[in-house]
Amino acid sequence: MLVGLIAIVLIPNLGDAKFRIPLTSVRVPVLLGGSRFNMTNDPRMPNRISNITFLVAFLSSLVLISESPREVGGVLMADGFSRIFSTMFLGALLLVSVATTHRIPAKTKAPIPEDSDSKATVDRKISVLIDNRRQVDFYILLIMVGLGMSMMTMATNLFMMIVCIELASLSTYVLVAFHKESPSGGEAGAKYFIVGSVASAIGIYGMSLLYLWSGSLDLDVLRESWQAMDGVDPFAAFGIGMMLVAFGFKVSAAPFHLAAPDAYSGAASPISGLLATASKAMGFVALFRVLVIITVPEGAEALWMVALGIFAVVTMTWGNLAALTSENPKRMLAYSSVAHAGYMLAAVAVVGSGISSTEESVVILTAVTFHLAVLVLFKLGAFLVITHLETEGKGHNIEHLHGLGNRDPMIAGSMFLFVLSLAGVPPLSGFLSKLLMINGIVSTSASTGSSDTSDIATWAESVDPLFWLAAAIVLNSALSLFYYLRIGLVMFFEEPASTKPLKAAPSLRMAIFACAILTLLCGVGPVSEWLLDLVNGAIDSFMHQV
């Protein structure tokens, strides 16, 4: 991706400039500046470079996913765990880059405004020129997000991890507010930046406490210090707690999620989808590294287990209740994303319970990672459908989905598939990932109940409270059906305001249909088995560090 970043800066600036050697008449071509070449001066060039960069990086990461671990510079480790998440991030960024072809379109030979033009024509021409001008800026930021996320997955040092997270986060703050001509975009970006900056500051302060306590920020050293600790050191406890606040913001866990709905609804839909999938997965990688590697004691309950379990239930319930009353589809999907964070936090809480064996922990973490992987398909796919509506200036109200089944049955069918998968309806990939998480929680906790199965009340009183986390996931998934099915209802049973078909947008449609097909294939069959095997191998690699 570093090559792609250099290419996207240099190629659009290639021209016929020459440098004259002093005291001679010899002119040497320098290729940068002067009159730009027609081919490289095309405003669509940055998008093409971005698409190629992410495609090559994604395929390379996929091919290398099973390679042996390799240490880089003493603070980075390329292993199965880092590669599976890098592949996930690059896949999401590739979809976003392809979708943005039509969300921020570039037009060749765009006309300039003239005195005889009407105000509407002038505004339209200026909008086209602005979109052309900011192509390079947008895709540079997108590649910077990819660089930060990919390096973050390999970090074995807490300082390196925070630096990489901030590299990705600062770029996403700008991307949220990228449409500065939109009042909602600027407001969303400001809120997201302020809350994110405060969360980052708290996390960095927590990191400094951990350094004060242990004298090192290497994850292995921190783990050894934690295991050797007698009792609970205040510096260590407060340090981990502050890190949890920072990462809680990244995964949109309540009550640190308050800026997320505004950011998702104000940003362009492809960026909202990126925040709901890749950015969330980045937060969970950090949680895995800090909670599981450093703080899970052998055969004992982790310090954070009860708090994380409570946060999980509050997060999933808050997200689903808020989504029920949302009229903005992007805001609804944002609260849905909060609920999904709660489901995954519940599973992570079980790993720190002290009653989970290594094998059961592998099953649970595999389920969470698999859910993060398939979330890229159906959550980002749903945002891409909203992107299609945004190309018409719509998508910010659920009324804009009315009659979509009549206007474009294929797009409406894909959207319905995505929301069913978000709800966890079989045989889709969202059902399989939720089933694996619930199965992991139940298999760990159910055996702690009374052996007298004839008395359900006695068993319910004696079973470990972790069991009720699985029950909370089931109940909240049932609750979520109300707002997910509402989307299907308005698409197929309401009359559209216009019967005009959606714009062609071929690359955007291709991305939507790819997500829909993979949502089906990853739910059952050989593709889901292949993906589960990859994820399981990655988690095995991760658990060897514990």
Question: Would you name each region that the model predicts?
Answer:
Residues 1-546:
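Alpha-helical transmembrane segments of multi-pass membrane proteins predominantly involved
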